[in-house]
């Protein structure tokens, strides 16, 4: 068997240098899979390679907004796996927060490019490998903000709605190729995006790791969850036909309630979220 994979199952992960992607890479490695880890964070990738062992992974810088980067990454991955891909985890994402008009237009467009257009690109580029692999799966990171449009992260939330809709459509389309498609809708996950997402309206100072863990909710559907909880969800998804995965599972109730009582959900969002920013014009 050609390449480093040597017949092992293989997963291609974007946003693999940190957070949910890194946790997933480590879990699948522990399960005996060959891991393709891709990110713009080269230092993070190099430290991941040291953890996994170079014989067990392929690391490569990948700008998900550049289709040629994706094509080159897919070709390099195929060389190591004999043209197979058991699972695509299209996970890279960024955020912007603040009132809609405070977020620079260019920054909003970049959120769309990274969070949605790059997912589309990943699927176009990965599909030939997925089709060539029995029981293959494309798994995509959506968000709890795809259950209802969320104020102050409006464009981010819209991209995650788009991901959810794409997942639903392609889960039907790709079935004719024997390829499954599903997504994960994480809530509050302990990753760098919580600390690094700019607040363009300026009323939320940056928080440290310690402050985040002290002040974040400890219970309820929006309690702070470790990145490993999403990795475990990705692992469970590979052996399942479930379409949407919620982390924690209670977030799924928002989807249920939105269908049954959309006005109630909207009223609750206005009541609970907007007062948090009442001092901001």
Where are these regions (language model features)?
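Alpha-helical segment proximal to the catalytic Tyr-Lys
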Residues: 128, 172-175
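Conserved glycine-rich cofactor-binding loop
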Residues: 17-18
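Active-site helix of classical SDR
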Residues: 123, 159
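Substrate-binding pocket helix/loop in short-chain dehydrogenase/reductase
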Residues: 99-100, 104-112
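Residue(s) in the substrate-gating loop at a strand-loop-helix junction
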Residues: 143
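SDR active-site lid
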Residues: 176-249
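Conserved glycine-rich Rossmann-like NAD(P)H-binding loop of the short-chain dehydrogenase/reductase
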Residues: 31-47
């Amino acid at each position: 068997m050609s390449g480093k994979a040597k017949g092992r199952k293989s997963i291609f992960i974007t946003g693999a240098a940190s957070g949910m992607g890194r946790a997933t890479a480590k879990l699948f490695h522990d399960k005996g899979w060959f891991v393709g880890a891709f990110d713009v964070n080269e230092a993070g990738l190099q430290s991941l390679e040291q953890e996994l062992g170079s014989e067990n992974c392929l690391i490569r810088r990948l700008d998900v907004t550049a289709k040629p980067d994706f094509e080159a990454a897919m070709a390099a991955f195929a060389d190591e796996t004999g043209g197979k891909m058991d699972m695509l985890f299209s996970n890279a994402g960024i955020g912007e927060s603040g009132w809609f008009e405070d977020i620079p237009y260019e920054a909003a467009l970049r959120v769309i490019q990274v969070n949605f257009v790059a997912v589309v690109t990943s699927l176009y580029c990965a599909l030939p490998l997925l089709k060539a692999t029995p029981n293959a799966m494309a798994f995509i990171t959506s968000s709890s903000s795809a259950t209802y449009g969320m104020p102050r992260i409006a464009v981010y939330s819209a991209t995650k709605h788009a991901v959810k809709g794409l997942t639903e459509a392609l889960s039907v389309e790709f079935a004719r190729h024997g390829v499954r498609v599903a997504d994960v809708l994480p809530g509050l996950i302990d990753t760098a995006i919580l600390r690094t997402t700019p607040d363009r309206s300026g009323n939320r100072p940056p928080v440290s790791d310690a402050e985040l863990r002290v002040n974040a909710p400890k219970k309820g559907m929006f309690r702070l969850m470790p990145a490993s909880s999403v990795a475990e969800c990705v692992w469970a998804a590979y052996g399942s036909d479930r379409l949407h995965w919620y982390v924690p599972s209670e977030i799924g109730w928002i989807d249920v309630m939105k269908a049954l009582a959309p006005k109630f959900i909207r009223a609750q969002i206005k009541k609970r979220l907007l007062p948090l920013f009442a001092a901001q014009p």
